[in-house]
Amino acid sequence: ELSVFSTWAWQWSNEGDMLYTTLFLSTAEIKDEIRPHVLWQTKLDGKVSMKPVPVTNHVTGEKELFVQDDRHTVYLINDVGRVLWKLPLGQQINSEVYQVDLFKNGKLQYLFSTPDKMYLIDRNGNAAGRFPVAFKGKCEQGISVYDYDNNRNYRIFVPCENREVYLYGLDGKPVEGWNPQKTDKPVVSKVQHFRVADKDYIVFADRYRFYILDRKGKERVRVSSVFDLKPHTDVYLTRKGGQPVLVFAGKGGQVHVVNFSGQTETSRVEGLSDRFEMNIVDWDGNGNGDVLFTDGNRVLVTRLDGTPLFEKKMEAKTLGFPYVYRFSAKDVRVGLTDPEQNQLFLLSADGKLSKGFP
């Protein structure tokens, strides 16, 4: 019974074509112990090729898993590991899998994209509405979906290689009134929406420039600085000195901080390869963002100005993206994977591995 545990979390992992779900449990009596327990495993037709996505069954309220394999087949798996349906797509999903309410009746669908199309699938595995919708150019960054006012009037951003950023509604049609200028280069980040001080900001980057627009596609904040960004750049909203800022990484270990007046600061973390992964975490609980890196078998944390806070070499070959799990206000842990050795790590801020890991 879950009620006896003070903290619990789910983790999904895979080994080849096997998908596992694990439950981590922490009791008040054993505060520093998080116990992993494999609940079920399911065999797929191919190797898992994306991080499994927990989705809600709108009929029962239970959690299910949406996942894709390397044969480009997607699956919906219920809470005991049974495959409810599978659907071949022909391409790899490159966006998040969003649950949306097309008919505003409480019944949810799955919205996602591949480089050539976006799909809307109901919980029975059937296409919904006017979907799939073919893009006007390759969309390598994937779609982003936002419900500005929580009224189920969804907006779907589609950044394409033709330097256009398109905006669609859930009816599969372009939204009238959205008219941004072409970017200088193809977009290298997902399009993101942030609301700061009751203002909306549409944010994305190309190889050298950073764009901050309003909901109509007009420039809201001018960022004059020039950057050198990676092909897939993540942008984070966090705080520095108590003020909201946007943070993203460039090549050569550069960390760029942009405030909402368009001013920029850049620091450099020495010794990083161009294969590093980055996330944002409040490492020391002071209310400001810190930068969390994985690079090879190393985990590093620095302040936004580059001041080092933490570094540890793991017994791993190559660490993947560092996921942040907050079990309580003072208990932040980093979830790490080593795909080459099929290992999972859960690391606390004091550098210790949680019991049962890897």
Predicted feature residues:
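Extracytoplasmic/lumenal domain signature
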Residues: 7-16, 21-358
